[in-house]
Amino acid sequence: MSIYKPAIGIDIDGVIGDSDKVFRKYIKKYLGINLRREDVKDFYYEKVLGIPENEMKNFWKRIDEEKRWLEIEILPGAKTALKYLKEKYQIIIITARPKNIRNLTEEWISKNQIYYDRLYFIEEHKGESKLSAILSNSINLKCFIEDRIDFALDFIKEGIKVILFDYPWNRIEKNIDSELLIRVKGWQEALSYL
């Protein structure tokens, strides 16, 4: 007899892995622009850098081809937190990473021994959202752990609690008055809300 466990949704980049650190490293190497984390005040690097979208696409293509995704380090406390959470919840990882790097993502998850029950990739360029992935798969979420404010707002509108890892790129929406949005500095604080 299986015991029902509620589900929580979790993003990869900015929540489980410190992808921004790797992206900034290669922005400096490939584009010659030095960015600090506090400089990244928008989720889209091309807006932060003031460069054409096409130039950023070439950057991402190079990141993909050189498998730089595998260099991303786990955020402090993430692995321990997921180990703890798996006892109480179904872990649903939903990422907006492109599907063409699915194998790299799965390799990264395996290499880092990240526990999860289900993994979904959304195709944002085709109008998919993390919320639509949840709704179309009839997943009843207790909460979602995220770093992108636009995805967080989608969940809040549906009455789903969001634990938002606080970064400069998600502070653009200043006046969000919702008990469903909880900003945290890291995993230890996030766990106190679960």
Question: Where do the protein language model's features map onto the residues?
Answer:
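Metal-dependent phosphoesterase signature
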Residues: 46-80
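Substrate-recognition element of Asp-dependent hydrolases with the DxDx(T/V) motif
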Residues: 69, 78-108, 120-122
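Substrate-recognition "cap/lid" segment bordering the active-site pocket of phosphatases
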Residues: 98-145, 149-154, 158
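Short, charged, surface-exposed secondary-structure boundary motifs
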Residues: 127-132, 171-179, 192-194
